[in-house]
From Swiss-Prot:
Domain-related comment: The N-terminal domain determines nucleotide recognition and specific binding, while the C-terminal domain determines the specific binding to the target protein.
Location in or out of the cell: Cytoplasm
Keyword Metal-binding attached: yes
This protein's name: Probable molybdenum cofactor guanylyltransferase
Cofactor(s), names only, from the UniProt record: Mg(2+)
Metal-binding recorded as keyword: yes
Organism: Bacillus cytotoxicus (strain DSM 22905 / CIP 110041 / 391-98 / NVH 391-98)
Described function: Transfers a GMP moiety from GTP to Mo-molybdopterin (Mo-MPT) cofactor (Moco or molybdenum cofactor) to form Mo-molybdopterin guanine dinucleotide (Mo-MGD) cofactor.
Database matches in Pfam families: NTP_transf_3
Family that this chain belongs to: Belongs to the MobA family.
InterPro entries referenced in this protein's UniProt entry, alphabetically: MobA-like_NTP_Trfase, Molybde_CF_guanTrfase, Nucleotide-diphossugar_trans
Domain of life: Bacteria
One biological process term in Gene Ontology: Mo-molybdopterin cofactor biosynthetic process
Chain coiled-coil ranges: none
Length: 199
C-alpha cells in the first residue's frame, strides 16, 4: 500500500469571512479540529499549514504538527502550503484539504486515496462539473513542479494541473453527499452550513 500523508491548508487570510475560518465552530468543534479528525480516520501522518497569526491557537486545538509556509514562499497561496507540507512530511502521496470544508467525509478521502496509481501525478475529483484540486491527492514528484511554478510567480492550482498527468474522478459514480463539499468563504455560507444536517 502506498504511504499517504495529509496536508490541511489553513494559511489564508480569510478576508471575505472576516475572521480565521480554521477557528470557527461547528457541531462542537472548530473547522480545523473537524478536518484533522476526519483525516486521522484514514491516515497517521498529518500536518497543518497555518497562517502565523493563528499558529499558536491552532496548535493548542490539535495534536498534529502545525507549521507555516516555507519562508521564501510565505503567503504565496495554496501551492506554497502544499509544498511546505510535502517538505515537512515524507510520503509517496499527499491528500490535501482546505480548512473551510468542515463537512468533508472520511468516506470520500478513502475513495480518493483508493484511486491512487503511480501512473498518475494527481488524483482530482470533479464534483457537479467542477474540478476540486484542493480536495485531491498528489504524488511526491509534483513537489518539484510546484517549486518551478512558484519561482515563475505562478500560483494557481490550474497551472499546476496543466503540468501534471492527472486522473480525474467523478463523484457521480459514488454515493456521495453534496454537503461534503460545502466550502465556507462568507458569513452567509457559514449560516447556511449551520442549517445543514450533517450527513
Amino acid at each position: 500500500m502506498k504511504s499517504v500523508a495529509g496536508i490541511v491548508l489553513a494559511g489564508g487570510m480569510s478576508r471575505r469571512f472576516g475572521e480565521p475560518k480554521a477557528l470557527v465552530s461547528w457541531q462542537g468543534y472548530t473547522f480545523i479540529e473537524r478536518i484533522v479528525q476526519v483525516m486521522q480516520d484514514v491516515m497517521q501522518d498529518i500536518v497543518v499549514i497555518s497562517h502565523a497569526s493563528i499558529k499558536e491557537r491552532v496548535a493548542h486545538l490539535i495534536e498534529v504538527p502545525v507549521i507555516e509556509d516555507i519562508s521564501f514562499y510565505k503567503g504565496e497561496g495554496p501551492l506554497a502550503g502544499i509544498v511546505s507540507g510535502m517538505e515537512h512530511l515524507e510520503a509517496e502521496w499527499y491528500m490535501i484539504s482546505p480548512c473551510d470544508t468542515p463537512n468533508i467525509s472520511s468516506k470520500w478521502i478513502k475513495q480518493i486515496t483508493g484511486q491512487i496509481d503511480d501512473e498518475y501525478e494527481a488524483i482530482i475529483p470533479i464534483v457537479e462539473g467542477r474540478k476540486q484540486p484542493l480536495l485531491g491527492a498528489y504524488h511526491k514528484n509534483v513537489k518539484e513542479k510546484i517549486y518551478k511554478l512558484l519561482d515563475e510567480e505562478k500560483r494557481s492550482m490550474e497551472q499546476l494541473l496543466s503540468h501534471c498527468n492527472v486522473k480525474y474522478v467523478t463523484g457521480d459514480e459514488w454515493n456521495i453527499e453534496k454537503t461534503w463539499f460545502v466550502n465556507v468563504n462568507t458569513k452567509e455560507e457559514y449560516a447556511e452550513l449551520l442549517t445543514c444536517k450533517k450527513k
